[in-house]
Amino acid sequence: MPIHLECMSHTPLHGYFDPAPAVVAEVERVQRAARERVDAFDPELVIVFAPDHYNGFFYDVMPQFCIGASATAVGDFGSAAGPLPVARDAALALADAALASDIDVAVSYRMQVDHGCAQALEVLTGRIDRFPVVPVFINSVAPPMASCRRARLLGDAIGRVVARMNRRVLLIGSGGISHEPPVPEIAGADDVVAERLIAGRNPSPASRDARQSSTVAAARAFAAGDSRLHPLNPAWDRRFLELLERGDLTAADGLTNEAITRDAGKSAHEIRTWVAAFGALAASGPYAASIDYYRAIPEWIAGFGAMHARERTLSRR
């Protein structure tokens, strides 16, 4: 059965601190076009590769990869909250396949996902509960982190199962590209911050609001050029998008963690979600991909990109 892929940057700042109206309209046109493609494809299963921003996964036990057998969206930054319609049998089959391929993936029956997953579902399908879904968490902010190569191999293991499914499957990669929002780090953190990174589940509304206000303030400073956050890197972003477009996925294996942080910022590690999604698609053979959008948007502290792809034999359908 056919497989369709959509990869897109996410931003929690949309609606909180926006660029010029013309830029917002531009992004929303790209998002509408992506949703129209998804509507036309009418998936029977959605697999979302997404990061987390210390809303669902913490240093008490920080897996590199985790597949949700049951999941709930926490609703941060105004994103949708509530249970996801997880396709449990499919989730467990994907976990078995990953483990059989020597990818040590965790499984959660109480996964919490944040805007990194929920926003992608809202933008691309209209709501978080429209289609059966399997959420796949990829650690992208909490060192130590697995390599891009491991993310590609995770995608390949999942994709080989997807290729045998008798249903239409939508693959989503949510995150990236160059960006470095003010995500706290456990290295050098004081006791209060460290405890939040270790066991910060289910924060109070006041605590969540304070964190969101801090992020908005950081975005204002970044857009004004008054910030120590890593600058956006459009040239790096375009090189990454182009390697995905031409199907040169093993080139991503050479993107070391140190180089990603140095060249594109500490949260650019979210490119792993794109690498995994494309790895899953490539497991079915050559694909045809399109770079649909790219713009560096400082108000959102994001190199904002979008791509879609299909198996090459189906790309004209």
UniProtKB/Swiss-Prot annotation:
Cofactor(s) in the UniProt record: Fe(2+)
**What does the record give as EC number?**
1.13.11.16
Subunit structure and binding partners: Homotetramer.
Could you tell me what this protein is called? 2,3-dihydroxyphenylpropionate/2,3-dihydroxicinnamic acid 1,2-dioxygenase
Return the similarity comment.
Answer: Belongs to the LigB/MhpB extradiol dioxygenase family.
Organismal lineage: Bacteria, Pseudomonadati, Pseudomonadota, Betaproteobacteria, Burkholderiales
Naturally occurring in which organism (per UniProt): Burkholderia vietnamiensis (strain G4 / LMG 22486)
Catalyses: 3-(2,3-dihydroxyphenyl)propanoate + O2 = (2Z,4E)-2-hydroxy-6-oxonona-2,4-dienedioate + H(+); (2E)-3-(2,3-dihydroxyphenyl)prop-2-enoate + O2 = (2Z,4E,7E)-2-hydroxy-6-oxonona-2,4,7-trienedioate + H(+)
A GO BP entry is: 3-phenylpropionate catabolic process
The protein's UniProt keywords, in alphabetical order, are: Aromatic hydrocarbons catabolism, Dioxygenase, Iron, Oxidoreductase
Q: Which residues form the active site?
A: H115, H179
Single GO MF descriptor: 3-carboxyethylcatechol 2,3-dioxygenase activity
Write down a Pfam family by its short name.
LigB
Metabolic or biological pathway, per its Swiss-Prot or TrEMBL entry: Aromatic compound metabolism; 3-phenylpropanoate degradation
Q: What does this protein do?
A: Catalyzes the non-heme iron(II)-dependent oxidative cleavage of 2,3-dihydroxyphenylpropionic acid and 2,3-dihydroxicinnamic acid into 2-hydroxy-6-ketononadienedioate and 2-hydroxy-6-ketononatrienedioate, respectively.
